[in-house]
Structure formats: structure tokens, C-alpha cells
């Protein structure tokens, strides 16, 4: 990837991630639903522009991602949802000219009455509205199209495969969604090792972290089955390089956790060195835990060969 493309992708990712994946509800309840999860909330998913913001928001629909609408102009009843929201939940707000991705459900009516056409509520309350930024909105729209396409598959295996393939996308929001789903459903497999290895050098800390977490799941499964992952030694050296040299303490700590999962006694020496010399307390702590695990599971006399602290991966 060229420096210009990488810089552009990094800037776009930072801009969109701040407003989307770490939105106001993350602070309100500790963990917000992901963009992927939000798109699954409603039977209808659209992108639209707010034309009026009174008791009901009048929205001009610009694009329909999922479902069908009786009209290109829809009315959204949101004031009642604001009244009923839980403590700490942010208010739903609409502003003139604002563009949003909206997850919708038809407005409920009294039993026996006919639902009024083109009247909706937000599915998931405040999580049913994702505002489009002034810059980078096309990346968000592209992500919505792709994710809804995956979610619409009827075969669960096809959905899982589509989620894995998100890691190959250039759009960082799709990559982020891919990592979230792969980790949630433990979809990592040996075929993904070359792709995941490339993410160990990605400029985004979150992608390096996520790739290490997927590796931990893959190595854990391999260890439980008692089989050796193809290319496992090369992979361990790559992860060890991250543990020693990544600029992020959080990433280094995760690399240590991932190495611990491999259960290799020959990591004792390097873990001892990291436990005593890494500048970060959290990394030293994780290395100490890994060292304790190694010493508990394997007597020192049975070390065999070791990964030398001076060996260059």
C-alpha cells in the first residue's frame, strides 16, 4: 500500500470511527452496538435527508438498503422514544439538512386499526440512527450496502464467509466490522493466517490488536485439537516481533497474551526478559503471567530449545 493511500485511509478511518463506533451511547452504557449490529436492527434500512424536524421528522429517502417503502418521503415518530428512553440514553435528534442512515420499523397502531403509510419509528431507539459525516460519507454508505448484502444471505455459512471476506476490503469500516464479527463468532481459520499477518504491520492500532486476538483464537483451537498450525513457528516469530517492538503498549500486551495461548515452554527466556524490561507496566504484567503459566505447565528441566532473546524474527 502506498504512503498516500495509507495516509488517506488512516485519516478517513479516524474521522469515521470517532463519530460512528465510539458514539455517545458508548459512554452511556459502556459498550455500544457495532455498525454491523445496528444495521440488523430494522426491517427497513435507508439513507435520507431531514426536511422537517417538528413533532415528527420528515425525511427524504435517498437510498433504500433493505426493505420496501410506500413513498420516498417518510415520517419518523421519535419524540415518544425520547420519553421512553432509559436513564443515560442520549436523546434522538433530527436537524434540517442532516443526512443519516436510518434503521426503521413501521409505527405501531391500536389493535384493529390500519397502520398509516410512510410512518415509522427508529429500530433500536437512538441506535437506529447513524448520522453521515460531512466528509467520508460515501465510505459509510458503501459499508452499509456491503453489510446489508451479507446479512441478507439465507445460508449461515455464506454469512460467515462474507464476514471473513470483509478483512480483504479497502474500506476501513468494513475491515473493522469484519474483525468484530470474526472475533464474535470465532471464525478465524488457518487459511486466514497470511492476511492476518499483514495486519500486524497495519497503521491502525485497532487492526493490529484485532489480528492478534484472532490469532489467539486460532492458536487456542489448534492447541486444543493437539495439531500443529501450518507455519506456526514463523507465526510465533512474527508475533514475538510485535511483542518486542510495537509502538503501542496495548498491542504489545496483546501479543504477549497471544503467545501465552500457544503454550510453548521455549518462550520462557523471552518472557522473563520482557517481564523485567518492557517500559509498560501492563506489558510487564502480561509477560509475568505468561511466565507463571509456562513454569506451572512445564518444569524448567524440560524446556528444550528456546526462542532466544537475541534471535531476530
Specify the residue positions occupied by each region the protein language model found:
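Extracellular C-terminal loop/segment signatures of secreted glycoproteins
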Residues: 81-174, 187-188
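Alpha-helix N-cap/helix-start positions at coil->helix boundaries
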Residues: 172-173, 205-209, 233, 247-250, ...
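Bacterial N-terminal signal peptides that target proteins for export
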Residues: 2-13
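Amphipathic alpha-helical scaffolding segments comprising HEAT/armadillo-like alpha-solenoid repeats
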Residues: 155-166, 188-200, 221-243, 264-276, ...
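Short boundary/loop segments of OB/S1/cold-shock single-stranded nucleic-acid-binding domains
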Residues: 28-43
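Structural detector for short beta-strands of small beta-barrel domains
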Residues: 41-63
